[in-house]
Regions:
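Solvent-exposed loop/turn segments at secondary-structure junctions
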Residues: 47-50, 83-87, 108-111, 123, ...
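Metal-dependent phosphoester-hydrolase catalytic domains
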Residues: 4-8, 17-31, 130, 139, ...
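Extracytoplasmic/secreted proteins, especially bacterial periplasmic and envelope-associated proteins
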Residues: 61, 65-68, 87, 91, ...
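N-terminal, active-site-proximal structural segment of metallo-dependent hydrolase catalytic domains
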Residues: 2-95, 275
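Short aromatic-enriched loop/helix-cap "lid" or pocket-rim segments at secondary-structure transitions
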Residues: 53-57, 91-92, 163-166, 196-202
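Active-site beta-strand/loop signature of hydrolases that rely on acidic residues for catalysis
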Residues: 40-47, 66-89, 138, 150-154, ...
């Protein structure tokens, strides 16, 4: 009799163990994933022209091509540089068929503007002063149930590495403080000259200033586009997307080298992450 009781007890334990260790249902897995991970697709693009042109800012005739790239790649947010102003942004938003809303930064000492486009209709935009320039930050959610993130669109001085360094330091100070309450991504054209063989480094401190600027960013943020290679003509990697160091996963990282039109000298950089 006792043998039957032992066998019955073992059978009950097996059933209980099978139920306990059974794989969760797909809905449970989905809910768990949504609680622990949020995906985000970002794109940055300097849509201006090469230095030899009379006007190196973005050209209105190129906006349909810019809109086509954005609609095709479907990023959650876009950082743009070298727009001529708010009128140009409104034209671009119209070409995007109401899928995005956006803003341009305040005007600094120059004649061109940074901008951010986002899908989130509830996004807010904040100008960020750095030296005599203005970057622009957007706070938004990639999905309704996702945590808030911040994307900062930046454009550092193209001609003076010391000014780039001062600009970068102020920008990162702001980003570090903001990152205490939300993940921060910094995207744009930093114009860093980090290749020792670059002829413009001869008899200058450009390499030193730019290397220290880049290192300063990497103390708090991760270079998400490093694997994608050059982002501009003449073998330059001067466009970046920096993000938190503790991302769960970095997915697609790509420079869209067939996207440039007219005499653009930059290509868009696309990065997908989970955080």
């Amino acid at each position: 009799m006792w043998v039957k009781l032992v066998l019955l007890l073992l059978f009950c334990l097996m059933i209980a163990g099978a139920v306990y260790f059974a794989e969760p249902s797909k809905s449970e897995e989905s809910n768990s994933t949504s609680r622990t991970q949020s995906s985000l697709r970002l794109l940055t693009w300097n849509i201006g022209y090469a230095e030899l042109e009379d006007d190196t800012r973005a050209h209105d005739k190129d906006l349909p091509a810019v809109a086509d790239v954005i609609l095709r790649e479907d990023p959650d947010a876009v950082a743009l540089q070298e727009l001529t102003g708010e009128a140009q942004l409104k034209s671009l938003l119209g070409l995007l068929r109401g899928k995005y809303r956006g803003a341009v930064a305040q005007q600094g000492s120059g004649d061109r503007f940074e901008a951010v486009l986002v899908k989130d209709a509830r996004a807010t935009f904040t100008p960020v002063a750095a030296r005599n320039r203005y970057a622009l930050a957007a706070s938004f959610r990639s999905r309704r149930d996702s945590p808030e993130v911040v994307l900062l669109s930046a454009h550092a001085d193209a001609f003076n590495a010391a000014r780039r360094r001062a600009y970068t330091e102020e920008l990162i100070d702001w980003a570090q403080q903001r990152s205490q309450s939300a993940p921060v991504f910094i995207a744009g054209d930093f114009n860093f000259e980090l290749k020792a063989a670059n002829e413009s480094n001869l008899y200058t401190d450009n390499l030193k200033h730019d290397s220290e600027s880049y290192s300063h960013i990497l103390h708090s943020f991760r270079d998400l586009g490093r694997a994608a290679g050059d982002t501009a003509i003449n073998d330059r990697r001067i466009d970046y997307i920096f993000g938190p160091t503790d991302l769960n996963r970095i997915g697609r990282v790509e420079v869209l080298r067939n996207a440039a039109v007219g005499r653009m000298d930059h290509w868009p950089l696309l990065v997908e992450v989970c955080f």
